[in-house]
Design a protein with these regions (language model features):
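Glycine-rich flexible loop motifs, especially short His-Gly-Gly/GGXG/HXGH segments used as catalytic or interaction
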Residues: 185-220
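A structural signal for short, hydrophobic/glycine-enriched beta-strand patches
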Residues: 2-195
């Protein structure tokens, strides 16, 4: 048993409940794929190589599911971001959806800015947990049977924990590349402990969510 017994038991309970939920809904039709966005965009408009790699992996899955006669939709999260004071011209969602459409994905199979606004309002989608919250909300409200997430290898555990906190457990797929935004050591010793200590899934009244929003949301 881990040193922090109560925290371990709490998360074990959440994980078991999430698995039970997925077992109950697997009879439903359809797969929802969340493609974790990655800032900054190239020239403020185009997905960077890490983001593009995830989108390419999702496209392959999309095409395979369609070939097998399955219904599949994709959600690309992410509001308009800034980094080091430089703001992207469009949202991560718009950049990702544009990329997917250009590579043959039916635009009617895409969720992006509309979902961000519906579930996060003016707060926007500015961290991994926001991404998972919106994807979970879409998954529940639209009655999908399966959920998949494509993300950074270093980011995968924290995103899985976010999903578990929101009551679901997707099929998690990591997409490696040479230069990654997320760092394994930072995740293990900074970001995951902060997430576990937050208690809200970085949602309502979260100090960490507020910090990230102030860091990444452009000043209009």
């Amino acid at each position: 048993m881990p040193a922090n017994d109560s925290q371990f038991l709490h998360w074990r309970k959440l994980a078991d409940e999430a698995r039970n939920t997925m077992a109950q809904v697997q009879k439903n039709d359809g797969l929802l794929i969340e493609v974790a966005a990655q800032h900054p965009l190239i020239d403020g408009v185009y997905p960077n190589p890490e983001f593009s790699a995830r989108l390419d992996a999702a496209i392959k899955r999309y095409e395979l599911e369609r070939q097998n006669g399955e219904m599949v939709k994709l959600y690309v999260p992410g509001s308009r971001h800034m980094q080091d004071g430089v703001a992207d011209q469009i949202s991560l969602s718009a950049a990702g959806c544009n990329y997917l459409e250009t590579h043959g994905v039916d635009p009617t199979d895409l969720y992006g800015e509309d979902a961000n606004l519906k579930y996060k309002g003016d707060d926007g989608v500015y961290n991994s947990s926001d991404e998972c919250y919106v994807a979970t909300s879409l998954f529940r409200d639209l009655g999908f049977g399966r959920l998949a997430s494509y993300c950074s290898p270093a980011q995968l555990m924290r995103k899985a924990l976010s999903y578990i906190q929101f009551g679901v457990l997707p099929y998690m797929y990591s997409v490696p590349c040479e230069h990654m935004f997320h760092d394994y050591v930072d995740e293990a010793f900074i970001h995951i402990p902060v997430f576990l200590g937050d208690g809200t899934g970085l949602q309502v009244n979260s100090d960490e969510a507020k910090r990230l929003r102030e860091l990444r949301k452009p000043v209009e």
